[in-house]
């Protein structure tokens, strides 16, 4: 208490941007009404999502269903001077360029997708170094493209058809793959027989797991439910794609096991079946991440798999206009790479309800997150810790996004990221994880996005103790799970949804016992309690079966049991996998 006469004064504490300390408290932690300008309010996307997996035996309803997120791992191989090099130095058996993606790709992205989200990245996500691209303009190259037409439904190319063309040489900056070819289209039908089809059958270079990407054109009369089926070693998996958005880029469907060579068990089929009158379009289909293609002067390509390269080069491969990926006109790939991550997000999301003031591909991305590791060290071997970053004013000083949402929504997001991460890592690893700061500063990755965004400096790649944790797969899982939970919490709260369900932890004591007659195997398991998340309670289990050299199937629900019987045949090798979800199965509508 201050003495008189100062005890009658009201004291206000502000930061250097004039924001009061009360305003720095995230909405979710407030006991009052909060700042409504940081919430989406009536702004929401209620349409068909960009892509849906129709073969899953369950449907998410209390997670991130139909939410579109833009996520990326920090840096990658880039060209500077006259050499290709990493953007960050070698330290403790790695470099940041390699380290951050070892958390984002195998852990964070699957967690978000398992919760129902559609996740996109400005960098290649597939570790597969082989690649097969099948396209209508070169129907016999790297596989086979075949069309089947029906009466009243003939595949054609429009007069203004501009689409993908597989490059026959390395990619110079002047090569625009999605502006060099054509696409095909056909009228839709509501009947389910005698369908027109387009089939892409690749010549798979080597047996293994390949990401499958499709591309198409978005026309004024495109439909929101184009039907694709991926045939793979585990059977077939069906998808619907909303072709009203996202034309002329790569859309990730999933990663599947394929046998080397060409066969009907390895292909993608698109039909003209739809519940809507209009057209479906067909363009290139890509199998696998592949190797670097971008060439630089006398130095050739980077020589690394595409997933190790910077976003600047993938953006060109993914159809971004050269004015957005080549912003320095070939003079500074590093600066291009910093800008292109946000440029790609804004281009893809432009024209959607969340980015109504920019032209683009109308994909309703509503959140962006860049995951980095930081520099800095302590000589006493203590933890250096985590840092989050946001930007509450853009380059012109605007405090609101084009949608009308306050940029302080990003402040809330970055605050929740660092708060939750500190609490989760401290609890799980029984230490005091260091919460550094939540910066509101001018960084391209948080200044340029047209939707709420943050940078998370997860830990220091320069600090020995941090890296003892950073190389631990359990730590990577725990860190990614904390980020997933924060995104789940933040995205729902922004739309006024205060209840959500966290996906459960993996089961333990998973066992298999053969029956006496050898015709069945008894699977049993125990659920794992998550002391940090009361909603992460298993409600249903899905069993996946792999027979012989095939891949896992699409799964079968066994309800909320802790044991089940699986029928088997003699002289066959089986592999069985189990996942659980925290919501009971609901039929697809």
Each model region followed by its residue ranges:
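Active-site-adjacent mobile loop/cap segments within catalytic or ligand-binding domains
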Residues: 188, 267, 273, 284-290, ...
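Non-catalytic propeptide/linker segments at domain boundaries
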Residues: 1-75, 80-85, 283-300, 304
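Residue-level detector of conserved catalytic or cofactor/ligand-binding positions
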Residues: 579-589
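Extracellular carbohydrate recognition and processing domains
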Residues: 233-262
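Conserved aromatic anchor
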Residues: 519-535
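A short beta-strand element within beta-rich, extracytoplasmic domains
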Residues: 196-220
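Active-site microenvironments of hydrolase-like enzyme catalytic domains
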Residues: 72, 308-408, 439-462
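Recognizes extended acidic, P/S/T-rich segments that occur
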Residues: 536-571
């Amino acid at each position: 208490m201050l003495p008189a006469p100062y005890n009658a004064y009201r004291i206000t504490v502000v930061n250097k941007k004039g924001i009061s300390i009360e305003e720095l408290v995230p909405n979710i932690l407030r006991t009052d009404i909060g700042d409504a300008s940081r919430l989406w309010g009536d702004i929401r996307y209620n349409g068909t999502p960009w892509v849906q997996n129709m073969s899953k035996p369950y449907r998410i309803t209390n997670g991130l269903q139909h939410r579109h997120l833009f996520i990326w791992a920090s840096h990658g191989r880039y060209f500077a001077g006259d050499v290709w090099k990493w953007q960050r130095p070698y330290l403790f058996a790695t470099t940041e360029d390699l380290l951050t993606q070892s958390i984002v790709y195998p852990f964070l992205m699957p967690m978000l997708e398992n919760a129902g989200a559609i996740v996109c990245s400005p960098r290649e996500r597939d570790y597969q170094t082989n690649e097969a691209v099948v396209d209508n303009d070169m129907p016999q190259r790297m596989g086979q493209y075949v069309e089947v037409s029906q009466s009243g439904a003939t595949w054609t190319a429009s007069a203004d058809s501009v689409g993908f063309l597989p490059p026959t040489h390395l990619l110079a900056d002047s090569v625009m793959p999605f502006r060099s070819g054509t696409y095909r289209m056909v009228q839709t039908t509501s009947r389910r027989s005698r369908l027109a089809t387009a089939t892409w059958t690749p010549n798979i270079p080597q047996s293994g797991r390949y990401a499958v990407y499709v591309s198409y054109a978005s026309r004024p009369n495109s439909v929101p439910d184009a039907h694709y089926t991926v045939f793979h070693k585990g059977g077939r998996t069906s998808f619907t794609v909303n072709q009203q958005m996202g034309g002329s880029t790569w859309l990730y469907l999933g990663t599947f096991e394929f046998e080397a060579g060409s066969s009907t068990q390895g292909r993608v089929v698109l039909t003209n079946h739809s519940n809507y009158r209009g057209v479906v379009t067909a363009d290139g289909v890509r199998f696998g991440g592949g190797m670097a293609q971008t060439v630089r002067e006398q130095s050739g390509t980077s020589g690394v798999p595409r997933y190790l390269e910077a976003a600047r080069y993938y953006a060109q491969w993914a159809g971004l206009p050269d004015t957005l990926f080549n912003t320095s006109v070939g003079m500074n790939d590093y600066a291009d790479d910093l800008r292109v991550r946000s440029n790609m997000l804004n281009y893809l999301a432009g024209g959607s309800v969340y980015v109504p003031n920019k032209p683009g591909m109308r994909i309703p991305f509503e959140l962006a997150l860049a995951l980095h590791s930081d520099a800095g060290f302590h000589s006493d071997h203590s933890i250096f810790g985590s840092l989050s970053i946001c930007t509450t004013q853009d380059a012109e000083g605007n405090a609101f996004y084009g949608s009308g949402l306050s940029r302080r929504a990003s402040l809330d997001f970055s605050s929740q990221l660092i708060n939750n991460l500190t609490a989760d890592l401290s609890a799980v690893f029984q230490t005091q994880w260091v919460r550094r700061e939540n910066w509101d500063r001018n960084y391209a990755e948080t200044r340029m996005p047209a939707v709420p965004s943050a940078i998370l400096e997860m830990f220091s790649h320069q600090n020995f103790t941090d890296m003892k944790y950073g190389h631990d797969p359990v730590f990577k899982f725990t860190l990614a799970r904390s980020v997933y939970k924060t995104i789940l919490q933040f995205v729902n709260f922004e739309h006024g949804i205060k209840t959500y369900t966290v996906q459960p932890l993996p089961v333990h004591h998973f066992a298999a016992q053969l029956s006496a007659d050898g015709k069945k195997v008894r699977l049993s398991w125990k659920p794992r309690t998550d002391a940090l998340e009361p909603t992460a309670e298993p409600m249903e289990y899905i069993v996946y079966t792999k027979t012989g050299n095939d891949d896992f199937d699409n799964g079968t629900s066994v309800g909320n049991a802790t044991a089940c019987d699986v029928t088997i045949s003699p002289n066959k090798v089986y592999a069985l996998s189990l996942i659980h979800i925290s919501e009971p199965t609901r039929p697809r509508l």
